[in-house]
Amino acid sequence: MEFCVLFGGASFEHEISIVSAIALKEVLKDRIKHFIFLDENHHFYLIEASNMHSKYFAQIKEKKLPPLILAHNGLLKNSFLGTKIIELPLVINLVHGGDGEDGKLASLLEFYRIAFIGPRIEASVLSYNKYLTKLYAKDLGVKTLDYVLLNEKNRANALDLIKFNFPFIVKPSNAGSSLGVNVVKEEKELVYALDSAFEYSKEVLIEPFIQGVKEYNLAGCKIKTDFCFSYIEEPNKQEFLDFKQKYLDFSRNKAPKANLSNALEEQLKENFKKLYNDLFSGAIIRCDFFVIENEVYLNEINPIPGSLAHYLFDDFKTTLENLAQSLPKTPKIQVKNSYLLQIQKNK
């Protein structure tokens, strides 16, 4: 089976998406037929596999690449001989952050009837916004940490609104990869933390910070009626897993497997199933959980995890191919014009 990797995008996580695509190339190798790069101006470009390395993208603004146009079933490429269509195999949406995870690309791919692996529109909207994720989890009976939601209008009253003690963690509501996230240990650190978070999002979440809390990450997908899980990761971290630890540490190829009881493993998987539901059909997602006093709490849903969390799966290629055979289908609307014909007939 062949794939096409779509990466880049106009978001703060643009470079992270490039790193993910390069990593996935090493895993899937010749199964990837095309690499499609989406730049910050929303232009699509075809990238040769031999150019999928960091040095090339560090200088990509100096390259003169012919832009492509997204169309039904593929991409259009203009040439001296006319317009040529590049037919796309199954697309892997690997655009992190805005564009890829907020629903824009999902709607575009669905509109042009291009088959893809990744979250659909509703799943993207709910998981990209951390506040909406909390509401979604609560409705499903999945616990989350207490929180305060701030915007520019009420940020001046932050200390009055926060009902829990220092330290607490400040994070943008609409951003991933630990961008704009800071731990606040005393009042004088709050202004900087808020300024940093509001750079990435119009809304900011504040949660209690629990030193040394147990954190477990679980990736997976639903293939027909059965769930396929990765092994459960227990991240090695300092206070929290920051941007550098996630994306600039190339010393690890495999994540540390968690040592936990069968009962706790089952709890994590049951919570994952509730969250995945049918909403995330067609996607490999990663749920990050906290365990506090033997209770499982959702930290966040990552709808497009870095490199699709391939490092957590014992057989990632098989998982991906099986998921490709179990994608949600959009019903085709049959337009018959029966009402218009009846109106015309009655004239």
Curated annotation (Swiss-Prot):
Location within or outside the cell: Cytoplasm
Highest classification ranks of the organism: Bacteria, Pseudomonadati, Campylobacterota, Epsilonproteobacteria, Campylobacterales
Gene label: ddl
Keywords: ATP-binding, Cell shape, Cell wall biogenesis/degradation, Cytoplasm, Ligase, Magnesium, Manganese, Metal-binding, Nucleotide-binding, Peptidoglycan synthesis
Binding, ATP: 161-216
UniProt similarity note: Belongs to the D-alanine--D-alanine ligase family.
Bound cofactor: record note: Binds 2 magnesium or manganese ions per subunit.
EC numbers: 6.3.2.4
Cellular component, GO annotation: cytoplasm
Cofactor(s) annotated in UniProt: Mg(2+); Mn(2+)
Top-rank EC class of the record's enzyme: ligase
Reaction catalysed by this enzyme: 2 D-alanine + ATP = D-alanyl-D-alanine + ADP + phosphate + H(+)
Main localization of the protein described in the UniProt heading: cytoplasm
Disulfide bond sites: none
GO process annotations (BP): cell wall organization; peptidoglycan biosynthetic process; regulation of cell shape
Pathway, per record: Cell wall biogenesis; peptidoglycan biosynthesis
Domain (ATP-grasp) ranges: 134-332
Functional summary from the UniProt entry: Cell wall formation.
HAMAP family tied to this protein: Dala_Dala_lig
Native organism: Helicobacter pylori (strain P12)
A Pfam family reported for this protein in Swiss-Prot or TrEMBL: Dala_Dala_lig_N
UniProt-recorded Gene Ontology molecular function terms: ATP binding; D-alanine-D-alanine ligase activity; metal ion binding
InterPro entries in UniProt: ATP-grasp (IPR011761), ATP_grasp_subdomain_1 (IPR013815), D-Ala_lig_Van_CS (IPR000291), D_ala_D_ala (IPR005905), Dala_Dala_lig_C (IPR011095), Dala_Dala_lig_N (IPR011127), PreATP-grasp_dom_sf (IPR016185)
Binding site for Mg(2+) 2: 300, 302
Protein name, per record: D-alanine--D-alanine ligase
